[in-house]
From Swiss-Prot:
Lineage of source species: Bacteria, Pseudomonadati, Aquificota, Aquificia, Aquificales
Matches recorded under InterPro entries: CinA, CinA-like_C, CinA_C, Competence-induced_CinA, MoaB/Mog-like_dom_sf, MoaB/Mog_dom
Coiled coil ranges: none
Stored Gene3D superfamilies: CinA-like, MoaB/Mog-like domain
Protein name, per record: CinA-like protein
Family recorded in the similarity comment: Belongs to the CinA family.
Species this protein is from: Sulfurihydrogenibium sp. (strain YO3AOP1)
Pfam families: CinA, MoCF_biosynth
Amino acid sequence: MKAIIIIAGSEFVQGRKQDKNGLFIAKNLFERGVDVQGIIISPDSHYELLNYIKFALDRADLVFISGGLGPTTDDNTRMAVSEAIGVPLIYNEEWLNKLKTYYKSNNVEITEERKSMAKIPYGSAIIENPVGRAVGFIKVLDDIKKAVVALPGVPSEMEPMFYKALEMLNINEKKRYTKLFRVFGIKELDLNYLLNDMKDLSYNFSPKGIDVFLYDTTLESFKEKEKKIKDRLGTFIYAEDNLEMEEVVGKLLRENKKTVATAESSTGGLIVSRLVNVPGSSGYVLGGIVSYVNEVKINLLKVNEEDIKNFGAVSEPVAKQMVEGVRNLINSDLAVSDTGIAGPTGESPNKPLGLHYIGFTDGKETKVYKEIYQGSRNDVRLYISQFALNLIRLYLISNS
């Protein structure tokens, strides 16, 4: 069985927002033995959506559409599906009554636009929305043995409705077992050496490390491979499935009742920004200093001016004094620092682009690590932030 996923939203086409629904739908379909032929990102335009739906129906058995079911003028999914399959839109009376009850109880007028969220193509089955107002639907095209599934774009609404759609389509049974291992601190060649005897693996490389994707069609074989990967990679695995490094570090900081502070130069606050992205981070993040210029390093972090003159701002002594300075200033349990050359300029004969020194201290011992990572400016900064967060993780798992 083949599927094509259509994500409706001009915000994705214009690069203002990153889609995650397509990945969620694709992963779950893959696990159930459905081969996804592609993910199409469409603007909100009725014309474009219509053409993409026709394109998908020509090539796939299942067409999943996420987004475009709201009450505004740019929500065109219902009409586009209706036109693509040649049936009119009708009100689902059950859902319309629920909308009327909801808006009446909230003293909100039930306008024609709001009523439109109860419209579905004739002959469709509704997928009730447990969270929001827009109803989803499945339209089975018996004559060509295909189906169109329309879901909202809000992930908290889409995900439970997607699982309900799978039940309604009778494709809920898992036929493939999958697992994502997120890995950091090991080189690509070393990883390949450790896992080169294993099939059914795929890799994705980024400044945040390596994602190792395992899949298998039998549970016994899957479990065997899963154990091998864990045994061979050990603490290089920082997360399983889609957790980010900052989420893992945040959990460890909470569990170990530790606080952290940062002193950043090259990363420009990215380390502390990632830490505070996690809800509840105020319980363990005390603060951060962006010491981008030498004066801030000297005046706030008490870095020795002579050391900057003798060794340069990008040096081991400076990284060491930065991390110790911020810990003393903010009075945290742990601290990390970075100083480096993110590029694309700033290199010298002895200091190449990408050179960084990353400091870590727990107040008893301070260590400084030298790293060279070359890429775009933002890729370098992202890698260094990941490296610094990983230092916190490794310390906490070895001192728990």
